[in-house]
Amino acid sequence: MKTTRREFAAGTAAVTATAGTAPLALFAHEKERNEKMKVLMVNGSPRRNGNTARALKEVADTLAKEGVASETMWIGVQPIRGCIACGQCQTKNLGRCVYDDDIANRIVEKLADADGFVLGSPTYYGQPNGALLAVWQRICFAAGARIQGKPAACIAVCRRGGSTAAFQSMNMPFEMLNCPLVTSQYWNIAYGRVAGEAAQDAEGMQTMRTMARNMAWLIKSLKDNPPPTREPWQMTSFIR
């Protein structure tokens, strides 16, 4: 039976509240302390080796120099579902999306071992790639507890403009999940049209390296410092 909108919203609040108040060991560090710190990066471009990939590579190379491992998952070019608000991920306590025919749950499986996250996307009409938004929204609903409280950053790549709006759109889910946003010397933006052209954006590449160093520093700083205990989410609506 399909979950009503009110039931779905209440379930979301309950899951978020639980994640916010549960012990850190359950969600933020579901691995041994002596393992190497790791950042999970998601390439949201339909071009596997385009400018988004080039920006993420700059981040990965810098993280490696700082002693932090990384893994990049490409969302690919196959159709990706959007969230249909069925609520089964929550009502059945699945911890994953009920639909298992695209990359969403493959990413979910990687969340627990990640100490930080980086999302990268090209800019389409001032927004991130729709496929990335679709998959990440489902992941946040189904497995947001495994993202909760971990450092996160987003990268927007564009030919000319619209990247700041895309950048903000990608940041917003992390802001709802109590994730410290990793900043840089500028917004995490790179410019380029043809594949690889972003490498010529000297300031953009420097921005990626600075963000990566900040990410490594923050992950290491938080390793043995659990977040504060959070109050349960007091969810209200404009219409009762």
Predicted regions located by residue number:
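C-terminal segment of N-terminal export signals and the immediately downstream linker at the start
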Residues: P23-N49
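A short, Lys/Arg-enriched amphipathic alpha-helix followed by its capping loop at the start of a domain
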Residues: E58-V68
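N-terminal secretory signal peptides and thylakoid transit peptides that target proteins
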Residues: M1-V15
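Cysteine-cluster motifs in flexible loop/terminal segments that predominantly coordinate metals
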Residues: Q78-L111
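Helix-loop-strand module that forms the ligand-binding subsite of alpha/beta enzymes
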Residues: M37, V98-Y186
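Glycine-rich phosphate/pyrophosphate-binding loop and the adjoining helix
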Residues: P180-R240
